[in-house]
């Protein structure tokens, strides 16, 4: 079976892990690299590439529907909420660390960085969250693979860089930094999770289904439902995070929408029952809208369309 993937270091690491897991199940695979629009246009923010929605996903869907690949591996947070019915998410792998990490040259934490320090990030959400806590900090766009980002930090182009901790883990790199609690920096929906998709009704679907991790599937679905009605995807400062409690009776859910400048935030932080959690998450999503979440998201989209913060989007 042929697995399609982006060609970045991180995407290849994720795909090689899936190939290894399938081999353990007796399934032989080969890997085919697909160049996506998100990879081709690294000189511009993601929201300027195909509208920012599915910039790393759409081309893989196309080659799968054309029968050129059997399986595709994605960072789940890159995947649009609305997906082709013919390409189901067959497996959600066990989640890696879902939180953000700040790397600075000398290990200085966010609250001790000097005024006017420059932090590189590719995420509107992280930018808004930084501004909420440290409005004196300057945020600048930072795209490229993880090696490139670390090199720019070492060269002094930034005083710090913020990215997903999971990316470092998947590369096998142990780098010390400040890891942020979801109570402080609510992560992007599905951050730290890898999804595996196939065409419906194929041998690949049956094989990949053996890799599905039930708990990770539950919480990632909850996270998507919480923010589904807000719209905007990676082009709005939105976070959501769900985790099953140790007693396995409830799910702790957090979701927030921020203004681009971080001065306004609407947040939900509640426990919902594990059984029936999907419906309860929908109710909380409606409440987030009623509290003004959609208004904030729409205002952010309008500002972006006018050029405000055009340097930032999502990504790792």
From Swiss-Prot:
GO terms for molecular function: hydroxymethylbilane synthase activity. One of its GO terms (biological process) is protoporphyrinogen IX biosynthetic process. The keyword Transferase applies. It catalyses: 4 porphobilinogen + H2O = hydroxymethylbilane + 4 NH4(+). Signal peptide: none annotated. Pathway: Porphyrin-containing compound metabolism; protoporphyrin-IX biosynthesis; coproporphyrinogen-III from 5-aminolevulinate: step 2/4. It holds the Pfam family Porphobil_deamC. The porphobilinogen subunits are added to the dipyrromethane group. This is Probable porphobilinogen deaminase. The lineage of its organism: Archaea, Methanobacteriati, Methanobacteriota, Stenosarchaea group, Methanomicrobia.
